[in-house]
From Swiss-Prot:
Tissue specificity of this protein: Detected in the head (at protein level). Expressed in photoreceptor cells of the eyes as well as in the region situated between the optic lobe and the central brain.
Species: Drosophila melanogaster
Gene designation per UniProt: dco
SUPFAM superfamilies: Protein kinase-like (PK-like)
Protein name as catalogued: Discs overgrown protein kinase
Sequence segments annotated as region (Disordered): 376-440
InterPro entries (UniProt xref): CK1_Ser-Thr_kinase (IPR050235), Kinase-like_dom_sf (IPR011009), Prot_kinase_dom (IPR000719), Protein_kinase_ATP_BS (IPR017441), Ser/Thr_kinase_AS (IPR008271)
Residues that, per the record, bind ATP: I15, G16, S17, G18, S19, F20, G21, D22, I23, K38
Cross-referenced PANTHER family: CASEIN KINASE-RELATED
Family: Belongs to the protein kinase superfamily. CK1 Ser/Thr protein kinase family. Casein kinase I subfamily.
KW Flavoprotein (keyword) present: no
GO molecular function: ATP binding; protein serine kinase activity; protein serine/threonine kinase activity
C-alpha cells in the first residue's frame, strides 16, 4: 500500500532519526524529486517538530541550511518535508577508518565555523554541535557542508533590542556530553562561545580518531556525565592537541576565554585555520579524504572529462584546468615533501601514523563490507556510489560560501540504519540523534 503525505509526497523507507522524530526518504509525486520527510507523532508529550520547522524557516536562505519544502500534519503525524542531503560527517569519518587528514579537517573547519556564524547571526545557538549534525550536500552541492537538527536550538538574544539572555547557573546538560563545553558541564547557561568550543572538540575528534573522555565506564548516565566532565576538566588543551599544529590550541583557548555574552570573532577563528592551510601548501580543490578513498590518487583523464561535462561556462573550464593542475602537482610532488610541510607545522612531530598515511594524496582502499559505526553499510552491495566528478577550483582562497558547482557524492539505494539527519542511501546520517544529555 502506497503511503502519501499531503497528497504530494510518496513515503519511502526510514533513513534516520533526529533528536525528535524519524526521517524517511520521500518522492515528490509530480516531479519524482527525492526529499527527506520527518515525522513526529502528534500524541507525543512534548511536540518539537513544529518548533524545529520554525527554526529552519528562520534560517532559510543561508548557505548550508537545508531547504524546507512543506510543513503540515497527516493523520497521526506532524510532518516536515525538506531537502534531501548526503552522508553526515560521522558517516564519512567511519568510511575513512575514523581518521581525517589535516587537509580535510581544515577544509571542514572553515565551513563549519561559517555555519555556526550564520546561525548566531539569526539570534540562535545550536546547542548540539557534533559530527552527526553536519551533512554533505548532493549533486551540484556535493561538497557543501550543511548544518541540521535544530531540536535543541535556543534563542540567545532578542532580534530587535539585541538584549542577551541572562547568565544562569545550575542548568541541566543539554546536547551531547562528548562535545559539550566545560561551562555546559558546570551547569552554566549556554551561549555562542559554547557552540564554538564544541566545534573545537569535534575537530580534535577528527584529528585523533577519539577523544580522551570516550569509552569511560560508569554504572549509569549521571555517573558517565560526571566522569566525562572530570576527564575533560583534567585534560589540558595543550595535552589534548599534542602532536597537532598550535592553531588548534589557540582556537580552543580563544573559545574558553570568551565572556558569556561576548560576540565571537568568527573571522579571526577562520583566519587561524586558513593561514595554517596556506602554510602547509594545501589547495582549495574540495578533494576530501572520502573522495580519495573512492577514486584514488591524482585526477585521471576520465575524471577531468566528467568535470568538463558537468560544469557551466568559464567556471567549467577553470575547474577542468584546476583539476589538471592538481593532477600534475600530485604526480610531481612526493609524499615525503608534503609530509615535511606538515611536520614543520607540528614543530617537528609527525602526527599520527594514520594521519601521515593520508597526506600527499596517498589513498586507502575499502572493498565492500561494513565500514563500522551506526550500522551504516558504507560501501559494497548497494552502498556508497559516487557518480559525479570532483571538479577542482583554481583558487588560493576558500570560496565555500558561494553555492557553485563542487565535487559531489550522490547516494544510491543502500542499507539503512543509524539516525541523526536527512542523509540517504548506503550512508544514512548520524548516530541516534541529538537528545538531551546524550552520553556519547
Amino acid at each position: 500500500m502506497e503511503l502519501r503525505v499531503g497528497n504530494k509526497y510518496r513515503l519511502g523507507r526510514k533513513i534516520g532519526s533526529g533528536s525528535f522524530g524519524d526521517i524517511y526518504l520521500g518522492t515528490t509525486i509530480n516531479t519524482g524529486e527525492e526529499v527527506a520527510i520527518k515525522l513526529e507523532c502528534i500524541r507525543t508529550k512534548h511536540p518539537q517538530l513544529h518548533i524545529e520547522s520554525k527554526f529552519y524557516k528562520t534560517m532559510q536562505g543561508g548557505i548550508g541550511i537545508p531547504r524546507i519544502i512543506w510543513c503540515g500534519s497527516e493523520g497521526d503525524y506532524n510532518v516536515m518535508v525538506m531537502e534531501l542531503l548526503g552522508p553526515s560527517l560521522e558517516d564519512l569519518f567511519n568510511f575513512c577508518s575514523r581518521r581525517f587528514s589535516l587537509k580535510t579537517v581544515l577544509l571542514l573547519a572553515d565551513q563549519m565555523i561559517s555555519r555556526i556564524d550564520y546561525i548566531h547571526s539569526r539570534d540562535f545557538i545550536h546547542r548540539d554541535i557534533k559530527p552527526d549534525n553536519f551533512l554533505m550536500g548532493l549533486g551540484k552541492k556535493g561538497n557543501l557542508v550543511y548544518i541540521i537538527d535544530f531540536g535543541l536550538a535556543k534563542k540567545f538574544r532578542d532580534a530587535r533590542s539585541l538584549k542577551h539572555i541572562p547568565y544562569r547557573e545550575n542548568k541541566n546538560l543539554t546536547g551531547t556530553a562528548r562535545y559539550a563545553s566545560i561551562n555546559t558541564h558546570l551547569g552554566i547557561e549556554q551561549s555562542r562561545r559554547d557552540d564554538l568550543e564544541s566545534l573545537g572538540y569535534v575537530l580534535m575528534y577528527f584529528n585523533l580518531g577519539a577523544l580522551p573522555w570516550q569509552g569511560l565506564k560508569a554504572a549509569n548516565k549521571r555517573q558517565k556525565y560526571e566522569r566525562i566532565s572530570e576527564k575533560k576538566l583534567s585534560t589540558s588543551i595543550v595535552v589534548l592537541c599534542k602532536g597537532f599544529p598550535s592553531e588548534f590550541v589557540n582556537y580552543l583557548n580563544f573559545c574558553r576565554q570568551m565572556h558569556f555574552d561576548q560576540r565571537p570573532d568568527y573571522c579571526h577563528l577562520r583566519k587561524l585555520f586558513r593561514n595554517l592551510f596556506h602554510r602547509l601548501g594545501f589547495t582549495y580543490d574540495y578533494v576530501f579524504d572520502w573522495n580519495l578513498l573512492k577514486f584514488g590518487g591524482p585526477r585521471n583523464p576520465q575524471a577531468i572529462q566528467q568535470a568538463q561535462d558537468g560544469a557551466d561556462g568559464q567556471a567549467g573550464h577553470d575547474a577542468v584546468a584546476a583539476a589538471a593542475a592538481v593532477a600534475a602537482a600530485a604526480a610531481a610532488s612526493s609524499h615525503q615533501q608534503q609530509q615535511h610541510k606538515v611536520n614543520a607545522a607540528l614543530g617537528g612531530g609527525g602526527g599520527s601514523a594514520a594521519q601521515q598515511q593520508l597526506q600527499g594524496g596517498q589513498t586507502l582502499a575499502m572493498l565492500g563490507g561494513n565500514g563500522g559505526g551506526n550500522g551504516s553499510q558504507l560501501i559494497g552491495g548497494n552502498g556508497l556510489n559516487m557518480d559525479d566528478s570532483m571538479a577542482a577550483t583554481n583558487s588560493s582562497r576558500p570560496p565555500y560560501d558561494t553555492p557553485e558547482r563542487r565535487p559531489s557524492i550522490r547516494m544510491r539505494q543502500g542499507g539503512g540504519g543509524g539516525g541523526g539527519g536527512v542523509g540517504v542511501g548506503g550512508m544514512p546520517s548520524g548516530g541516534g540523534g541529538g537528545g538531551v544529555g546524550n552520553a556519547k
